[in-house]
Amino acid sequence: MNVIVCIDEQNGMLFNGRRQSKDRVLREHAASFAGGKLWMNSYTAKQFSEENCDITVEEAFLSNAPEDAWCFVENVDLKPYLHKISRIAVYRWNRLYPSDVKFPMADFSARWTLVSREEFPGSSHERITQEVYQL
C-alpha cells in the first residue's frame, strides 16, 4: 500500500479533529501522482468532491485497499498499518499550524529512503513540498 499525508513544519496533521489546511493544487498534484485513483475515508472525500479522479471511499480503506493503491490519509492512525506501507508521499505545507495529532515521522525516517523531492506553488500556499519515501 502507498500513503499520502499532509503535514506542517512540526509534523502536525490535525487540530481539534480537523485538518490543518487544504489546497486545490495539492489535491490535483496528489491525484495525478497517484495515477488518478485514490482510496480514502468519507472525511477526506469531502475535500475531493470537485476533483477529476477515481475515488474509492471506505471507512476501512487502509485495511481494504489493494497492495498497489494510493491512500490519502488525514485522520487515521498509521502505526497499525506500518507493515503494509511500501511508499509514502509526504506533502509539507512549509508552515506551522496548531496541531494535536502528529504524523509519526520518526517511525518512517529510520526505515525509509527519500527517493524524490519536489516543490510547487499551491493555490493557498506559496510553496508546497512533496517528499516521496520508500522502503
What is each model feature region?
Residues 1-135:
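Enzymes that bind and transform nitrogen-containing heteroaromatic metabolites
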